[in-house]
A protein has these predicted regions:
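Active-site loop architecture of trypsin-fold serine endopeptidases
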Residues: 29, 35, 42, 63-66, ...
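Bacterial N-terminal signal peptides
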Residues: 10-20
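Cytochrome P450 catalytic-core helices
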Residues: 102, 106, 223
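Glycine-biased strand-turn-strand hairpin within the trypsin-fold
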Residues: 26-43, 48-101, 112-114, 125, ...
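Conserved catalytic-core segment of clan PA serine endopeptidases
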Residues: 98-99, 118-148, 158-161, 174, ...
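C-terminal recognition in membrane/secretory proteostasis and scaffolding
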Residues: 2-7, 23-33, 40-44, 94, ...
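Short glycine/Trp-rich loop-beta-loop segment that forms part of the substrate-binding cleft
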Residues: 103, 125, 158-179, 258
Length: 467
């Protein structure tokens, strides 16, 4: 079971482990040659890095169902809709200061929906924070400490592409809210995609990571941030030696978007669908091992089509960096950055060739024309939009999806009570094909004796009748 690392609590403690380290940055990797080398301490590295790792406290107001819901006595007065209770929910995670002006990087799930965010430094100082940029698809958030101080301790960001399996690492965070804690381990694997994330490409480590470590630092032996601790695989919620970190090179791209003042994190639009290469496909195509991203569909006029990609081909590398799976392709394109031109190595009929692609954000070729549907109809309270590659990308839908999509719903609105959900695609209303938000708005006027609605959800058509 995957566990995102977030926990409530307080306090402070410190841990250290062993391994060789000079006070100077080491440029060469080496294997310990004696037991004496194994008895040296990580303490100099901890002193160098731990000050930039902070605790992140987030508070949010949440709606809880009344404990009297379903009680016949209280339903005499309130009916079936019992009033909800508003409660304050607190959570605790970690973060890393990456700029001296107080810029902090953490996980989106640590601060998502928070009404109030504070950070605490290892020296005990606390500061309020503002959210500069956040994105649930890559699970990253940039915070800015509200302070006149422009000289906060900083953890420099390293090159995660230089990380190798077997490298020594430190994990620094605030597990279970006990206070700043340091653990050590090695890089167990690279390019992991078992974590639910839009850009499925993670560093795996056996350094002990527990709930509360979310947003904490994974550092190399030269004191650089190489990953942001994000998730663990665990049956009981504690560490079992399988932890995952978002690579630092993705953190760099996300920080650059925040520094530019971007309000959203735009990833490159490919205009194609991909699937993993199976052993059967690898054998049929003459691949020496199971790797790459199999092209299954290409959108006419999209970047992939312009680059010459065709269904049935396999992308095996980008800028000569091997592509292990479709998630790795998405990661490499994202870290290359918008505006970059990349070289794709493509396998077609057993032969490899190169194609170039210039990266751009998904276009809004059809104006989204958002509308809040109101009135006496099943969609009352739903905000809908015309689909385009950009809207589809924002909602994690296939790029070639057309029509009208439900973006969000007002709480307790007729649309929500009837079971509609964000990402539902409205296909027809009373036999009228819904091709735009204007058509939908016109279709829900009037007072028919019943409503016949067809939607598409997760690729399945659903037909419903309402009176």
């Amino acid at each position: 079971m995957q566990v995102l690392l977030k926990r409530t609590a307080v306090s402070m403690i410190a841990l250290i482990m062993t391994m060789p380290l000079s006070a100077q940055a080491q440029t060469a990797k080496s294997v310990p040659q004696s037991q004496m080398q194994m008895q040296l301490s990580f303490a100099p590295l901890v002193k160098q890095t731990a000050g930039a790792v902070v605790n992140v406290y987030a508070e949010r107001m949440v709606q809880r169902q009344s404990p009297f819901a379903g009680d016949p006595f209280f339903e005499q007065f309130f009916g079936q809709r019992m009033p909800n209770r508003t409660e304050k929910q607190s959570s605790l995670g970690s973060g890393v200061i990456v700029e001296a002006n107080g810029t902090v990087i953490t996980n989106n799930h640590v601060v998502d929906g928070a009404d109030d965010i504070k950070i605490a430094l290892s020296d005990g100082r606390e500061f309020p924070c503002d959210v500069v940029l956040k994105d649930d698809r890559v699970d990253l958030a940039v915070l800015k400490i509200k302070s006149k101080n422009q000289n906060f301790p900083v953890l420099p960001i390293g090159n995660s592409d230089a990380v190798e399996v077997g490298d020594l690492v430190l994990a620094i965070g605030n597990p279970f809210g006990v206070g700043q804690t340091v653990t050590s381990g090695i890089v167990s694997a690279l390019a992991r995609n078992q974590v639910k994330n839009e850009v499925g490409f993670f560093i795996q480590t056996d350094a002990s990571i527990n709930p509360g470590n979310s947003g904490g630092a994974l550092t190399n032996m030269t004191g650089e941030l190489i990953g942001l601790n994000t998730a663990i695989f665990s049956q009981g919620g504690g560490s079992n030696g399988i932890g995952f970190a978002i690579p630092a090179n993705l953190v760099k791209v996300f920080l650059a978007a925040a520094d530019r003042g971007d309000k959203t994190f735009d990833r490159p639009y490919i205009g194609a669908s991909f699937e993993p290469v199976t052993s059967d496909v690898a054998e049929a195509l003459g691949l020496d091992k199971v790797r790459g991203a199999l092209v299954t569909k290409v959108v006419d006029g999209g970047p992939a089509a312009k680059a010459g990609l065709k269904a049935g081909e396999v992308v095996t590398a980008i800028n000569n960096i091997p592509v292990e799976h479709p998630d790795a392709l998405g990661y490499r394109l994202t870290t290359a950055g918008l505006g970059a031109t990349v070289a794709l190595t493509v396998l077609d009929n057993g032969k490899e060739h190169q194609e170039s692609m210039t990266l751009a954000a998904a276009p809004e070729s059809t104006p989204r024309n958002e509308k809040l549907i109101q009135g006496n109809n099943p969609f009352s309270g739903a905000t809908v939009a015309n689909l385009s590659p950009r809207v589809a990308d924002e909602l994690h839908l296939p790029a070639d999806t057309n029509g009208v999509v439900v973006e969000n719903l007002k709480a307790d609105s007729p649309a929500e009570r009837l079971g509609f959900a964000p990402k539902d695609i409205v296909v027809s209303v009373n036999g009228v094909a819904i091709t735009s938000t204007d058509v939908l708005q016109q279709a829900v006027t009037g007072s028919p004796s019943f409503w016949r609605v067809e939607i598409e959800r997760d690729g399945q058509r659903i037909r419903q009748f309402f009176r």
